[in-house]
Amino acid sequence: MEYLIGERNLARNTQHSYRDAVRLLVVFTAAKARKKVDELLISDVDADQLRTFLQHIEEKRKCSISSRNQRLAAIHALAGFIAERCPEYLDWCAQLRTVKAKRSAPMPVCYLEKPEIDALLDAPSSATKLGCRDRALLLFMYNSGARADEAAKVCIEDLSLHSGADGTLSSVCLHGKGGKVRVCPLWTSTTNILNNLIAGRNDKERVFLNRCSQPLTRFGIHEIVTRYARAAMNRVPEMRNKRIGPHTIRHYLPFLTMSSDFAGC
């Protein structure tokens, strides 16, 4: 982990992904070799074993091809790390790197039409505290194009909210993949609902909290989006044919900016 942080400067999520990949490989190899984890040797993992492991996580753990390739990249990085420090393993590293990433057909991008996004935004109840939070979350993601992970990490101090009376736009600072930061403008409607949500709270707090006043996770946000998407399907049945998640809302913003609907936001 020190190498990933200090020398590679990888983002926290990537660090965790690499750690999990190595853990899965170690457990799988120990089971196949019928050894305890602390008895494993580097020679217990060869190219054939790596291919078997990748097939296992695809078929048994139901990993997508993208996740499979992420696991492979982590193992290649581990092999390179070992070879750099122990040159006697250069051939072993080269052998593992003969295992290539798997190609996949590009997934079709799912877009929402204006009536569909409206139905999604209207699904939360404004009569409850959690309903108000969920509407604020959906509108924020719709406005900013934030990923679920980015929305989960937004703190109150990342928001710059203005009334707009002097022409100053509200904005949010989003912390994305690889430590990248970008600033996104916020509409008046988004500003108003966020002001209500964060009133009286500490600037260091996350904007979106769960019912226990703990920060929402990206998994929690995904569950919220899919729950309201199911509710919105009752109003717009065409949505039943679409796989809707946080990224679907993210895809709507570029479409919106190219349409006449954007002027009214």
Positions of PLM-derived features:
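Conserved catalytic core of the tyrosine transesterase superfamily
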Residues: 1-265
